[in-house]
Swiss-Prot record:
Ranges of Basic residues composition bias in the record: 61-73
Residue ranges of coiled coil: 52-80
Protein name as catalogued: tRNA methyltransferase 10 homolog A
Any one GO molecular function term: tRNA binding
Biased composition (Basic and acidic residues): 308-328
Record's keyword terms, sorted: Coiled coil, Methyltransferase, Nucleus, Phosphoprotein, S-adenosyl-L-methionine, Transferase
Highest taxon above the source species: Eukaryota
CDD domains: Trm10euk_A
The family this protein is said to belong to: Belongs to the class IV-like SAM-binding methyltransferase superfamily. TRM10 family.
Species, as recorded: Bos taurus
Reaction(s) this enzyme catalyzes, per UniProt: guanosine(9) in tRNA + S-adenosyl-L-methionine = N(1)-methylguanosine(9) in tRNA + S-adenosyl-L-homocysteine + H(+)
Amino acid sequence: MSSEMLPAFSETCNVERQKNLSEDGEQNQKPGSSERFQPISKRQMKKLMKQKQWEEQRELRKQKRKEKRKRKQLERQCQPESNSDGSDRKRIRRDVVHSPLRLIIDCSFDSLMVLKDIKKLHKQIQRCYAENRRALHPVQFYLTSHGGQLKKNMDENDKGWVNWKDIHIKPEHYSEFIQKEDLIYLTSDSPNILKELDESKAYVIGGLVDHNHHKGLTYKQASDHGIDHAQLPLGNFVKMNSRKVLAVNHVFEIILEYLETRDWQEAFFTILPQRKGAVPTDQACESCSHDKKFARVEGGLNSDSSEEENRHELDSTHEEEKQDKENSTESTVNSVPH
């Protein structure tokens, strides 16, 4: 290759190299190329794993639903012919005794909650509705001040709520259609302890999921409006590791359970979730007294052993002093000339 051709050849190589570099740069800048190599966080990985597991178990869930339908069909076919007219169902329904007690979920705190908490409240209300429908002593269920974010969320995610039965859903505040002297607001901040339920009264549960951001709000509202207030006798029967504030559905279900059993302790321990770490107060007191007694006995043993050691040390010291005295006397006697 002649010296005249070298500059042209090197220039051509440089042009091709720049072209390749620009193509690589464009490829790297394509949308999605950087996302492909982004690391996945642990939370995203868990979501992906759950989604994958959900998809893998789709057929299994379908099969279980199918088996459940077949099982129910067989149960219906095995029923005696005398019950073919539905008399058995009527007998079961006759066992249900509706309570005149009015139980109200006050939804007037809509503006104090973010959407995530609104959705939680919606689920708790769904649970209350379902439990009341299957209860042996269902209450007169009221949902008041219904509107705002809650109604919007129910319209979007639970359109069937408009067909709910045995429930009074009202946009008005409960004070507009229930007399003040009939109302009792249930709040954990109240100094009044509820001993038993008066089924002629209307009990109000604050529909608020606030994670303790608005502590004492329901108590203040009841006091400002001159409404009687009380708290469930939780502290009389239950010792818990966590705070005494319960979810809306837990309060609702405890009242349903009490109406059936007339036993507060049984109602609490039937409904309270295990994560609350609830134990009966008498067991908690026995445990505390046992721990104190054990500590006292253990401390007594330690002090006794210390006294014994001290006495032993004193006796040893006296013995050494006596021995030294005898030795000194003996040496003195031996040193005297005979």
